[in-house]
């Protein structure tokens, strides 16, 4: 069962830059939602505005500050800090990024949810990295999103008017000035695939999402960088264990670090006393 707000193209042949990048897709996919496009129109609750002309940090911060309850999502922790520092101190302003430990993130997200429901707190502005685009249930009437692929843009829009409290929420896509952009690798490929779509596209339409992923896939050199298919289709053996070790849905080269947050050091001391070690 595949379910997401930004469903990739999963069926049909899409040709890449070489035969290794050809995507043959999955056959016989069945849509479980009747009248998909009609339902899509009924659930439309966000207006999306895109401005790809480069702006400075000061210009973006000034635009964000025009709104009292607003979320701004950027691509890097540096961009998050630059914009956060430029926001006025006329209300509550908060920051979310992986510079915070999970417990701190969880606490701050809970605080944001409480503040958004507090009518006595009219100004709540949040600057965040992409971590809020997946699995974070927050709802702002206005969302800003730094330039990115269409799938990321729509995930950001999913934090806007999420509960349908207003007739229409508004999501703005902006671009930083050239010297600040610094998009590399897959992020640059995703953004360029979006830029190649017609400017008058219906950005929420399933057909537009399909066109976007066709653009993105066509730029690929290969879909199997570690040649995992080789281990699954050897004539004499099926090397499932080797393939499993090589496959990573999301590359993760991180190392867990225990930091002093709330009562963590007390817990660490208890572990040490019990003879446990952490490495």
Model-predicted segments: where are they?
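C-terminal helicase lobe and adjacent C-terminal extensions/tails of nucleic-acid helicase motors
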Residues: 58-67, 73, 78, 82-109, ...
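Short secondary-structure boundary/capping segments
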Residues: 14-23, 87, 142, 188-190
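Loop/turn-to-beta-strand initiation segments
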Residues: 1-2, 69, 122-125
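Conserved ATPase-coupling elements of RecA-like P-loop NTPase cores
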Residues: 136-140
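A short beta-strand-to-loop transition that corresponds to the Sensor-1 phosphate-sensing loop
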Residues: 3-7, 13, 74-77, 128-131, ...
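Interdomain hinge/linker at the junction between the two RecA-like core domains of SF2 helicases
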Residues: 5-64
